[in-house]
Regions:
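Topology signature of small-to-medium multi-pass alpha-helical membrane proteins
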Residues: 1-130
């Protein structure tokens, strides 16, 4: 049963989503479009993971704005982000199992991203009335 009474919690979730999105865009953009030094500092990054996360950063911001405005579609967008991130994480896991080069911090980051978006969806879907 939705609990539409918790605007504060949704605002916190929205702020987390927007901040996470802006940081993702900045970090991913610096590797994709920045200097060679930025790419070297990133180590063995995986291009499809990097591109997905960079583009998803923009979706994070849109989802955060929707959550702030208490729009039901924002909860479904959060689910889409969680599922998409999990799918890219699974493809990344296959790359690792096949012996591809990677950074351990990417495993941690993808775990965090998947968890954060699953939690945001679970929370928002219970707080925004249909």
């Amino acid at each position: 049963m939705p609990r539409p009474d918790n605007a504060r919690g949704l605002r916190i979730a929205a702020a987390v989503a927007v901040a996470f999105g802006l940081l993702t865009i900045m970090e991913g953009g610096s590797v994709l479009f920045g200097s060679e030094a930025a790419r070297l500092e990133a180590g063995h990054y995986v291009p499809f993971v990097l591109w997905f996360n960079f583009l998803a950063g923009f979706v994070y911001v849109v989802a955060g704005a929707g959550l702030w405005a208490r729009r039901r579609w924002a909860a479904w967008l959060a689910l889409s982000v969680a599922v998409g991130t999990a799918a890219v994480f699974a493809a990344f896991a296959i790359l690792i199992l096949l012996g591809g080069a990677f950074e351990l911090r990417t495993v941690a980051a993808m775990s965090l991203r998947t968890t954060v978006w699953a939690v945001i969806f679970a929370y928002a879907s219970r707080r925004i009335a249909p």
